[in-house]
C-alpha cells in the first residue's frame, strides 16, 4: 500500500510540474507578465539564442547542485527527484514555445487575448503548484534552494525569496535596456 501511495504522489507531482510548465509557456506567450525568473531567462534567451526551457533546465540544475554543496551529507536523497522536474519543465517549455510548430505558433493576436493567455497561464501555474505541494515529494528546485539557504543561514524564507525576485527583475531590466541599446 505504501508503494501505491508513493506512485500516486509521484504521478501527482508530474501532473503538477507539467501544469506549471504549461502555465509558464502561456504566461511567456502573453507578453504581459510572468515570473521574475522566467523574465530573466527570456532576456538571456534573446541575447544568447538559447531556448528559454533549456536555460530553465540549466538554472534548475544549478539550484540542485548548490543545494547539494550547501547541505552535503544532509541532502535528502528524495530531492534527487528535482532533476526530472528540471528536465520536464524545460522540455515542455521548449516544445510549446519553440519546437512543435502548431503549439509554438499559438500566440495571442490582440490585447484582450494577451490577457486571456496570462489568465490561463496563472491558473495553470497555480493548479500545478497546488498539485506539486499536495504530492509533498519535492519543491521546485529554485524554491528548494531558497529553503536550504534560509535554514542554513537562519534568514526568513520570504525575505530571501523577495530578494531573489528583486535581483532577477533588476537584471532583467538592465538586460532589456542593453538589448534596446544594441538595436538602436
Regions inferred by a protein language model and the residue ranges of each:
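C-terminal ends of transmembrane helices
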Residues: 10-16, 63-75
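Mid-bilayer segments of alpha-helical transmembrane spans in multi-pass integral membrane proteins
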Residues: 87, 91-99, 115-135
Amino acid at each position: 500500500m505504501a508503494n501505491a501511495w508513493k506512485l500516486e504522489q509521484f504521478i501527482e507531482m508530474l501532473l503538477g510540474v507539467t501544469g506549471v510548465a504549461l502555465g509558464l509557456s502561456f504566461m511567456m506567450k502573453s507578453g504581459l507578465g510572468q515570473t521574475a525568473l522566467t523574465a530573466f531567462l527570456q532576456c538571456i534567451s534573446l541575447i544568447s539564442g538559447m531556448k528559454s526551457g533549456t536555460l530553465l533546465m540549466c538554472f534548475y540544475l544549478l539550484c540542485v547542485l548548490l543545494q547539494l554543496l550547501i547541505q552535503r551529507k544532509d541532502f535528502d536523497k528524495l530531492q534527487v527527484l528535482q532533476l526530472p522536474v528540471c528536465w520536464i519543465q524545460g522540455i515542455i517549455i521548449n516544445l510549446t514555445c519553440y519546437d512543435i510548430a502548431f503549439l509554438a505558433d499559438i500566440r495571442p493576436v490582440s490585447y484582450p487575448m494577451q490577457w486571456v493567455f496570462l489568465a490561463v497561464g496563472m491558473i495553470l501555474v497555480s493548479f500545478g503548484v497546488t498539485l506539486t505541494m499536495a504530492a509533498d515529494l519535492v519543491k521546485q528546485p529554485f524554491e528548494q534552494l531558497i529553503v536550504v539557504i534560509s535554514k542554513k543561514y537562519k534568514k526568513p524564507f520570504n525575505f530571501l525569496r523577495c530578494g531573489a525576485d528583486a535581483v532577477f527583475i533588476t537584471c532583467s531590466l538592465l538586460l532589456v535596456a542593453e538589448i534596446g541599446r544594441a538595436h538602436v
